[in-house]
């Protein structure tokens, strides 16, 4: 069974909810999924090399991703993610820059095989967000299996 990892950084719980929905979409495609709040992971806590797909998300706060996700990205750079399927997501109130910055890091620095674009939602339960997040998870899972 393929393995996927979803790691999120949240302030109000919306990004966590989106992470859970993305994981659900990946499970629909037959994936075994681990979901972690980035604060639960210590410096050497998990090996990203063990996963077929890696999905990272952060809320946007004052135009930036949360500091805990920035720190995690520096740690993730030490892993071999070249060519692995990936996606980036996040919740936002006003501007929503964090998912795009994570996506760019995963594309250009980690050299991952990313889905078409990051998923940006004001909230998981608003405007079709549940289906959008589940479909995003399905898309990532299919990309990893292609």
Please name every model-derived segment.
Residues 12-16:
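Glycine-rich NAD(P) Rossmann-fold beta1-alpha1 loop
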Residues 2-4, 17, 21-38, 49-146:
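FMN-binding flavodoxin-like domain, especially the glycine-rich phosphate-binding loop
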Residues 40-46:
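Short acidic active-site motifs
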Residues 8:
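Nucleotide-activated donor-dependent transferases that construct or modify glycoconjugates
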């Amino acid at each position: 069974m393929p393995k996927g990892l979803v790691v999120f950084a949240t302030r109000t719980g919306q990004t966590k909810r989106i992470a859970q929905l993305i994981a659900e979409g990946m499970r629909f495609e037959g994936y075994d999924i681990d979901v972690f709040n980035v604060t639960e992971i210590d410096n050497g806590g998990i090996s990203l090399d063990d996963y077929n797909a890696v999905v990272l998300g952060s809320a946007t706060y004052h135009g930036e991703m949360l500091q805990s996700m920035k720190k995690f990205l520096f740690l993730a750079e030490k892993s071999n993610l070249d060519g692995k399927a990936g996606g980036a997501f996040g919740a936002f109130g006003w501007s929503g820059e964090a998912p795009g910055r994570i996506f760019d890091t995963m594309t250009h620095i980690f050299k991952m095989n990313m889905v078409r674009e990051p998923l940006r939602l004001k909230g998981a339960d608003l405007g079709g967000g549940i289906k959008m997040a589940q479909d995003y998870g399905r898309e990532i899972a299919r990309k990893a299996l292609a």
